[in-house]
């Protein structure tokens, strides 16, 4: 069995790695579907918001923020038992439901597994709505990036 070395010098099996990111990796090490990266920015309510999308096979990772910090990471996926996608907060402040809600709505829209890291302050409720509208606009213009 092939093993991949982790950043923390631990070992994880190739099959575990494939399952974690739902990727299609051949035993030779070649990637079936390429991982792509897409970046865009927008000035929203006098604040520059950056978006970073990493497209995976069967899903994508979306980072939203104004500072380069990974925070409030949520994951969402479809459920065969409920029309509302499942979601959980992996990292961050449990009182901030924005990443969970955004991940759920993106999963419902795309039918994909979605990871969302949302690093914007909860100071203005309009900000999260405008951010989500900007993401939807980008998805319409560049559907192949998500």
Which residues make up each language-model segment?
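N-terminal, charge-rich interaction modules
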Residues: 2-69, 74-77
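C-terminal helix/juxtamembrane-tail motif
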Residues: 4, 137-146
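N-terminal/domain-start segments enriched in small and hydrophobic, helix-friendly residues
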Residues: 29-33, 41-42, 85-91, 142
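Structural motif
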Residues: 59-62, 88, 112-115
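Fold-independent oxyanion-binding glycine-rich loops
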Residues: 65-67, 93-94, 118-119
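Short, internal acidic amphipathic alpha-helical interface segments
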Residues: 70-111
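Short, compact, well-ordered microdomains
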Residues: 107-139
